């Protein structure tokens, strides 16, 4: 049967990334308390394509996922990327997995337990070297210092979305990374709060006002103190309660120089 993908292309244009995007597929994530957690990821898989090939073999990406069915984990991402390079005769392979991860949290006063969802990301690239990035998105509460200072009856607050991506010299638990970030807002966010908990969380936020700038700086100091983290990017978006826009701040460390390669795109 004719293989059109392997036919020669005469336009002399190499393609940096080609593959499949947004495949929903079950994966296994290492859980600090329960050994492992099963979840469903949205997966992107790409390879490079030399200028002389007309196309890549799209079906092989899905075949590779099926080959690793039930065994797709953080530990074997490098193996999966190598298989992509081998099967698709590529010099570079890219893999990104976005998935929900659940952690049981306890309310501060009632001690009521509930599952809190966090959006997580694993991203890997394999060419001559391996590059792996772990990302998490953590919701926080932020109370406006200016509003508290000038108001006689309370202060307005925001729900913050803190996005952190890190490169590591050794393994870091998702739970630990999330815990560090949750210490950096006015107050944490919970899935379940009773009245006594709402009172405690509200008062905690009021006693700990923070601008968006304060949050990214606090997270930056936390991550700088972790020797296993070799690079990170922190973004915080505060969804304003009295404005029709958001407040935003970002820190990348080490900072990128003008002639350096840009940080990997999400």
From Swiss-Prot:
Known catalytic reactions: GTP + H2O = 7,8-dihydroneopterin 3'-triphosphate + formate + H(+)
Pathway involvement of the protein, from the record: Cofactor biosynthesis; 7,8-dihydroneopterin triphosphate biosynthesis; 7,8-dihydroneopterin triphosphate from GTP: step 1/1
One Pfam family cited in the UniProt record for this chain: GCHY-1
Enzyme class: hydrolase
Molecular function GO labels: GTP cyclohydrolase I activity
Site (described: May be catalytically important): 144
InterPro entries listed in its UniProt record: GTP_cyclohydrolase_FolE2, GTP_cyclohydrolase_FolE2/MptA
PANTHER family xref list: GTP CYCLOHYDROLASE MPTA
Family note: Belongs to the GTP cyclohydrolase IV family.
Name of the protein this chain belongs to: GTP cyclohydrolase FolE2
Organism: Syntrophotalea carbinolica (strain DSM 2380 / NBRC 103641 / GraBd1) (Pelobacter carbinolicus)
Lineage of the organism: Bacteria, Pseudomonadati, Thermodesulfobacteriota, Desulfuromonadia, Desulfuromonadales
């Amino acid at each position: 049967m004719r293989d059109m993908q392997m036919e020669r292309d005469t336009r002399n244009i190499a393609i940096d990334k080609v593959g499949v995007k947004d495949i929903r597929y079950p994966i296994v994530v290492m859980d600090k308390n329960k050994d492992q957690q099963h979840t469903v990821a949205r997966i992107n898989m790409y390879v490079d394509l030399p200028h002389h090939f007309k196309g890549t073999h799209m079906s092989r990406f899905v075949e590779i996922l099926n080959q690793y069915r039930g065994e797709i984990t953080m530990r074997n991402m490098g193996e999966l990327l190598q298989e992509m390079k081998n099967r698709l005769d590529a010099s570079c392979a890219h893999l990104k997995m976005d998935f929900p991860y659940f952690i049981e949290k306890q309310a501060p006063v009632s001690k009521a337990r509930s599952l809190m969802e966090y959006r997580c990301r694993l991203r890997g690239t394999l060419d001559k070297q391996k590059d792996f990035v772990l990302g998490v998105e953590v919701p926080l509460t932020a109370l406006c210092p200016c509003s508290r200072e000038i108001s006689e009856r309370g202060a307005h607050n925001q729900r913050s979305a803190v996005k952190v991506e890190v490169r590591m010299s050794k393994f870091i638990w998702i739970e630990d990374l999330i815990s560090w970030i949750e210490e950096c807002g006015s107050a944490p966010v919970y899935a379940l709060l009773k009245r006594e908990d709402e009172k405690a969380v509200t008062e905690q936020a009021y006693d700990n006002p923070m601008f968006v700038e304060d949050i990214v700086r606090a997270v930056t100091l936390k991550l700088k103190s972790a020797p296993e983290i070799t690079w990170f990017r922190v973004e915080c978006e505060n969804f304003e309660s009295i404005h029709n826009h958001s407040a935003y701040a970002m820190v990348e460390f080490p900072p990128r120089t003008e002639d350096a390669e840009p940080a990997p795109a999400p």
